[in-house]
């Protein structure tokens, strides 16, 4: 078992909407079970995000961009692309392909968000290319689409792990 850090020691993040179930173990941000969502204290306008993630079989999570637009993380073996599957902006934009390394393997997102235009690269393949997000995802923190907002990692659907989360300004 590696070194563990309670979330209280993780600077720049806080749990909202539920129980604190997040831990940092050997540099991996881990949600151990169904619990709260994890939100950055920082707010972002136009940005590029790199994040690596790992989910268990039947896992379900997501990354809310600016706290408003959910990029889906879900176990979807042999699925056809849909707006509720991995690579999608939940409920709005369908990926061109399901490009997953599967459960229990590391996957990566490289996401660029400028205004409401989003590009999503999943495991090295562009699955959404500079498309407009038509509205906010259910569960969004607010509806002020012109304002900067936080990143939010979904923890209310069960276990998930993240590492190498890097946000840089777009442009």
Predicted regions and their residues:
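Carbohydrate-interacting regions of secretory-pathway proteins
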Residues: 1-171
């Amino acid at each position: 078992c590696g070194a563990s850090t309670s979330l209280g020691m993780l600077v720049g993040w806080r749990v909202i909407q539920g129980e604190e179930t997040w831990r940092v173990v050997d540099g991996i941000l881990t949600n151990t079970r169904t619990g709260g969502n994890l939100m950055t204290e920082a707010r972002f306008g136009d940005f590029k995000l790199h994040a690596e993630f790992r989910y268990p079989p039947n896992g379900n999570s997501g990354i809310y961009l600016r706290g408003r637009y959910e990029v889906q993380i879900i176990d979807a073996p042999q699925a056809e692309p849909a707006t509720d599957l991995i690579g999608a902006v939940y409920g709005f934009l369908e990926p061109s392909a399901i490009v997953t390394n599967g459960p229990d393997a590391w996957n990566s997102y490289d996401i660029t968000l400028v205004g409401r235009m989003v590009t999503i690269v999943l495991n090295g393949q562009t699955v959404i290319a500079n498309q407009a997000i038509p509205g906010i995802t259910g569960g969004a923190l607010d509806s002020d689409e012109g304002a900067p907002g936080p990143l939010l990692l979904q923890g209310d659907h069960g276990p998930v792990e993240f590492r190498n989360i890097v946000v840089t300004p777009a442009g």
